């Protein structure tokens, strides 16, 4: 298996309360099954508030409600997560732990990316003065999870990726504003 990441991937670190456009508002917040089961046993006021705010989604999964302003019910006035504060990083659901990181597996490649929907990722990406490069590392072992990607979809994904890489490599403007 080959793991491919943009060269700035490891530079990302969540800026939490300093973020002006929090990922904890305006989004549907899904809860994976393991987190859902853990939240059922979480003690205290935070656990109670979390359980009251959970709901079943149309597909049988679970989510966390948002308030009237679209903010996650666990997001406090300082734009910090009360669940994280009370129970630590390990208590967060997969979507909260992973975002803005995401990946797709196809053929023998795991492509990891950072979403430009995140303010800090944008800051990192647009402050680069050199074209983005992709770093590959070969891992041993077979992947059994291709995320249901068909051969046509994998070919299309690789073609789009080649085009985007070409655009990144052609970029020569030293000013992030010119980008």
Residue positions per predicted region:
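Hydrophobic, Leu/Ile/Phe/Ala-enriched alpha-helical segments that form helix-helix packing faces
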Residues: 43, 164-171
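Intrinsically disordered, low-complexity regulatory regions
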Residues: 143, 161-166
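Conserved small/polar residues in nucleotide/adenosyl-binding loops
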Residues: 171-178
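Hydrophobic scaffolds flanking metal-cofactor catalytic centers in soluble metalloenzymes
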Residues: 1-139, 149, 155-156, 160
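Glycine- and acidic
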Residues: 146
